[in-house]
Amino acid sequence: MPALGNDAPAPDIDSPYREANSTGPLPRLAVGVLVALCAAKLLLHIFTSVRHYGYFRDELYYLDMARHLDWGYVDAAPLIALYARIALWMGGSLAALRILPALAGAALVALTILIARELGGGRYAQFLAGLSVLLCPAVLLADSLLTMNAFEPLFWMGCIWVVARILRTGDSRLWLWFGLLAGLGLENKHSTLSFGFAVTVALLLTHHRREFARRWIWIAAAIALALFLPNILWQIRHHFPTIEDLANVRREGKNVVLGPLAFVKEQIIDIGPILLPVWLSGLVWFLRDRRWRVLGLTFAVFFVLMEVAHAKNYYVFPIYPMLLAGGAVVIESAIESTFERRLGTRAAQTQTATRAAVAIIVFASLPAVPLVTWMLPPERLLAYQNAIGFKPAKAEVHHESLLPQPIADQFGWPEMVGEVAAIYNSLPPDERAQTGIWAGNYGEAGAINLFGPQYGLPRAYSRHQTHWYWGPPPQVYKNLIVIQWGLDDVRDNCTSYQAFEHYQRFGMGEENQPIYLCRGVTFDIQKIWWHSHHWN
């Protein structure tokens, strides 16, 4: 593959836009800035991500995936299971789990700095771009949990860096790197398909459409397809469960649907109001500048696609570092133009202006940091939310909790497992041997499977999402400890039952339901297992 580190234009004189995009050497890379900001990002997450809270519901699910490595899952591409497997290899602790997204976040800061440099940004633009990503609330939240969302912007911005180099140098061979990163991105999260679609449409809407007459972009597409193929084959073999899952979510109205204005409003809030001038100036510059218009159109197409599809607002977040990098270059240029060329001021005065701009961004961004990192215990976080008048937006219709959902979903799991263990271990040994655990949700099943062994609990089974494929249990149980069953289900399927109250103040409201000991199960779990599943 062609080298990504080559700063000079490529000698490929046949490129369709070679002459228009030839440039001189890139600005010097601000290595000290890059190292300092990446270190700050990493240390921030190391010191906050394991304080006061526990495992996130989805993290428990991914740890179960890590014990069942496969080329696909009902609601996830396969790489998330590999990340979790690495965390298990490192001990499976919360710290081992959370160091991976922290590293991804630090890498994203570095990549954003490289994009700003590729766009012609000097030392200040590189610093502002990296700082903006470091302080962006949406990015801080994503990098505080082990989910595919922490890694998604890394793959996308890697692709954008490649596109920017192609636009600057005209070296079409670099599409091979795009294909590699896009293929890995598809194995990380399927929404990379929409990102790739947006890039394709953006190219077709500009004079760069001529790139499709060359072989490199098609070879890149073949590379991406080859990397994505194992997951496609898994989907075919399992009759496309991901499509069924998405259809169920839409049909059941699980997610809050935002109108166009509300969608834009949530973007501004979550990216950070103080960063609006940064990313908006980047978007305007991209759309107005013929050379970088592909980048602006990529964002525009993707944004419209997500709004029309009524996607969750965070689906757009991975593409913003590109705009923050562009905006940083615009601001650097504007300051230099205003203070040096028009006013004839000295370099020292220009530095004062740039430092003032940085200070404004830092101090205006700080109030959001406690809301998206785990630095405050729940009582103080509630008090802080009330003090600043912050009310977290709901992403799901049935979300009921005192705290934002990403935080509430970290509460109550060890306590719930302890309660199940108390029920299980209170049974006589012969009855215990005939008692299984049925969880209604992958979070409960994952918690039992993570914390249960220390209590001697058997593995929990569930028909929720991919857990359905990991069943049925190897034996027919006479009794079940059931979590997230309604009372009617218990009465219909148990000869007798006992209810045990379960309550967690800061957890999700849906978890505050009784745990039941169901004696004399009236069905054969192995026979009914494959009759239905719960995908939503």
Report residues per predicted region:
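Membrane-interface alpha helices of multi-pass inner-membrane proteins
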Residues: 68, 129-130, 162, 174-189, ...
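Transmembrane-helix motifs of polytopic, lipid-linked glycan transferases
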Residues: 35, 95, 99-120, 158, ...
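Transmembrane-lumen/periplasm boundary regions of multi-pass, lipid-linked membrane glycan transferases
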Residues: 51, 184, 195-292, 306, ...
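Specific aromatic-rich, kink-prone transmembrane helix
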Residues: 111, 151-169, 174-182, 326
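Membrane-interface transmembrane helices that cradle and orient dolichyl/undecaprenyl
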Residues: 16, 20, 117-120, 159-175, ...
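Short acidic/glycine- and proline-prone juxtamembrane loop motifs at membrane-interface regions
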Residues: 138-152
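Transmembrane-helix signature of polytopic, membrane-embedded enzymes
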Residues: 3-4, 14-17, 21-23, 27, ...
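Short helix- or helix-capping micro-motifs
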Residues: 38, 126-134, 182, 186, ...
